[in-house]
Amino acid sequence: MALWLLLVVSLLVLGGCATRPINPPIAEVHPERGYRLESRQAHVKDKSNLVVLAFSGGGTRAAAFSYGVLEFLRRTRIVGATGKEARLLDQVDVISGVSGGSFTALAYGLYGDKLFSEYESRFLKRDVQGEITARFFSPRYWPNLWSSNWGRSELAADLYDEILFNGATFGDLDRSNGPLIMASATDISTGARLVFDQDFFDLLCSDLDEVPLSRAAAASSAVPVVLSAVTLNNYGGSCNYAAPRWLQLLTGPTGPPRPAA
């Protein structure tokens, strides 16, 4: 009995040390910097056309389907804007992904063509759900799971990082030459769409470059009840944020106010 009590106390103490990654604050918004479309104009292949792919969710099946789309585009040849033959895949400027589709999008943004030699073995053909379940029932992870600062989605994010993303962050994507990747999740408090790009993180007064890709994938695929919500720190109001001009025009009044009757 004393041994079991000692074990429980030890697990609780260790669990109190576990914490989630913290998205860091920024002191000032710089619209020309960070991982956003406006700062990646040099990566747009054809200035007359913006080519966007949208990958939907649906678990591993969605990840496999979106991977098949990329493979097809890689094999398809077209005549590019310069008059030379090119791969259709190389004309893609933006990839939006949610849930299972976000894994493929983020991995392609990180690895480029290397994806086609590794993605199947490292992710698609693994029993990822089984591995998450095994970790959940492993005593090794119980201390972390008992911590109020670390949930089931953090457990999943750690696995995604180990098997696919290798510690990469959005800063690594920002330094790549690939298309802009926009992983989406849902704000559980409002039901609104949350996009992992610096435009949205400016609202939080936070630096997206330091956020691991694995956390974006975990947030995008966090099925309610099965997985916990991924928490982001909100430092809003501390970085002199001002809405961009296009947003002001969209949300502002369309004409002068009318006098009350």
Regions of interest found by a model, annotated:
Residues G15-A261:
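Catalytic domains of lipid- and phosphate-ester/thioester hydrolases
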Residues W4-G15:
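Bacterial N-terminal signal peptides
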